[in-house]
Regions:
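N-terminal export and membrane-targeting signals
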Residues: 1-6
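C-terminal motif of bacterial Sec signal peptides marking the signal peptidase cleavage site
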Residues: 12-15
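Bacterial lipoprotein signal-peptidase II cleavage site
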Residues: 17-24
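Structured C-terminal helix/loop/strand segments within mature extracytoplasmic catalytic/sensor domains
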Residues: 24-114, 120-144, 306-476
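Second-shell loop/turn segments in exported
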Residues: 71-74, 173-184, 218-225, 232-236, ...
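Active-site-adjacent helix/loop patches that line small-molecule binding or acyl-intermediate pockets
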Residues: 100-105, 109-114, 224-329
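Active-site SXXK
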Residues: 181-211, 429
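Short glycine/serine- and small hydrophobic-enriched flexible loop segments
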Residues: 194-202, 247, 251, 300-307, ...
Length: 476
């Protein structure tokens, strides 16, 4: 997602089905099968909200067959591309064409009680097969059993109309819904940091030890050798999404024998789509589509990080899953870093306070860490250029979250908690989509020289605001 200056981009080689001309979303579609079971009110609201946003109206700066599409080719280490790549897409924006098919979306809202326990959830999947979105039933353990999850496929999303080929969870061949998971981009760093903090709790890592990161070979994604404390790497990974720090943490997990146990832990907890696989033990890079996360399992992971008393849900083996999976100290550190997120520009857009674009999102407090004397936000040399103090005065919630993007991923996952006297809602929201930096709104303005460019369609901000408005009313 972000390199040292916060401006990186990646790509995927795009192919187009011969049956669907570029610039048109096919109107021909057999009625999709609906999953079995009841869905919650929050799921129904989320589906209706996503449908009303008309995500299919975004423009594609690298449509199939274009020179821009041909220049985006590597589905591995997508975050490793340069500012030149992103500038190329921005330059192509005036000639962008309508997206050729319904975008891919995986969204979950997990409602919490005042003690942090999940009480209801809504998951909606949208794809070329489910153009209006489909609400997914879950069981009492907040598990979606009637979905066949597939790995993201950069070429196949266009060529196969969103149909994946590699299964993520075994034994789901007869599931009603078949859905290709979006590549999670930098939201994968939630799994990485969870794994490192698990090692710290087990005494296999000390947070204040200096870890000498010596990659061999050096990866364009990860950069060269560094020597920092584990605590510092965690801070940089979560607050401003440093790829270098995150690669160091992945390499640390490999060196301390933490990767396989982490993936097994996710399986044991019933978080079957959370898989940190295929990374390179020599440098912590090689981030690819074998790294998977669904919005529902990500929300459940965040529920554990947030903390709740007693059993949060029951694992497949019948054992209770509790917040004791991390120590109180590790959860506090994790939450603190998520609460200092610098990039508040997808579901929440307070970094862009006061402008006509993008639309306002979740009305969060922008962390003071990034606010300069003039009220503008600068995150590791990424300058947003707007005074956020008026939005902070009107803020209603704290949003402890992690964002991510590459050219064909937009992702945001976090915990929303109302400020005192501001409505009392507490919930977790996670959104994954393929509408990354490659896709733009027709009304997107240009940014002044030296200002961080817009990363997402403003439709995600409208989604965040609509979800928060619904949750505020629910708690009245």
């Amino acid at each position: 997602m972000y390199a040292s200056a916060g401006l990186v981009l990646s790509g995927s080689l795009l192919a187009c089905s011969a049956e669907t001309p570029a610039g048109k979303v096919s109107a021909v579609q057999a009625a999709p099968k609906l999953p079995k079971g009841k869905v919650s009110p929050v799921a129904k609201n989320l589906r209706a909200t996503l449908d009303k946003l008309r995500l299919q109206e975004v423009l594609d700066t690298a449509p199939p067959g274009s020179a821009q599409a041909r220049s985006l080719g590597n589905p591995v280490d997508k975050e490793a591309q340069t500012t030149t790549d992103r500038a190329r897409l921005l330059a192509a924006a005036p000639a962008a064409k309508p997206i050729v098919q319904q975008p891919q979306v995986d969204a979950t809202v997990l409602e919490l009680d005042r003690r942090g326990r999940p009480v209801s959830s809504g998951t909606v999947l949208m794809s070329p097969a489910y153009k209006n979105g489909v609400a997914i039933p879950v069981d009492r353990n907040f598990t979606a059993k009637d979905v066949r999850w597939r790995q993201w496929d950069d070429k196949g999303w266009y060529a196969n109309k969103g149909q994946g080929t590699i299964d993520v969870v075994p034994g789901r061949e007869k599931a009603t819904v078949d859905h290709m998971l979006n590549y999670p981009a930098s939201v994968l760093k939630l799994m990485v940091n969870f794994g490192v903090l698990r090692l710290a709790d087990q005494g296999k890592v000390k947070l204040d030890e200096t870890f000498d990161y010596k990659p061999d070979p050096v990866s364009p994604l990860c950069g060269g050798a560094t020597a920092k404390t584990v605590r510092q790497y965690i801070d940089e990974s979560l607050t401003w999404s440093s790829n270098g720090a995150s690669c160091a943490l992945v390499k640390l997990l490999h060196e301390r024998g933490g990767i396989d146990p982490l993936n097994q832990t996710f399986q044991d907890f019933g978080l079957q789509t959370l898989q940190l696989k295929g990374t390179n033990p020599a440098n912590g890079g090689r981030w690819s589509n074998s790294i998977t996360m669904s919005s529902l399992d990500t929300a459940k992971l965040l529920a554990l990080v947030n903390g709740a008393p007693g059993k949060v849900w029951t694992a497949p083996n019948g054992k209770p899953v509790t917040s004791k999976v991390l120590s109180p100290a590790s959860r506090k550190l994790f939450m603190s870093k998520l609460g200092q997120q610098g990039y508040n520009d997808m579901l929440s857009t307070t970094n862009w306070c006061g402008g006509t674009y993008p639309a306002p999102g979740i009305p969060q407090v922008t962390p003071s860490r990034w606010i300069g004397k003039d009220g503008t936000v600068t995150v590791n040399a990424s300058k947003f250029g707007r005074d956020v103090r008026p939005c902070n005065k009107k803020a209603e919630v704290r949003f402890s979250h992690k964002t991510g993007w590459v050219n064909n991923t937009a992702s945001d996952a976090g915990i929303v908690r109302a400020l005192p006297g501001k409505g009392g809602r507490t919930y977790i929201v996670v959104v994954f989509s393929n509408l990354g930096t490659q896709y733009v709104d027709a009304n997107r303005p240009s940014t002044p020289p030296g200002i961080y460019p817009f990363s997402y369609t403003e439709k995600f901000a409208k989604l965040g605001r609509a979800i928060d408005t619904y949750e505020k009313k629910r708690r009245r």
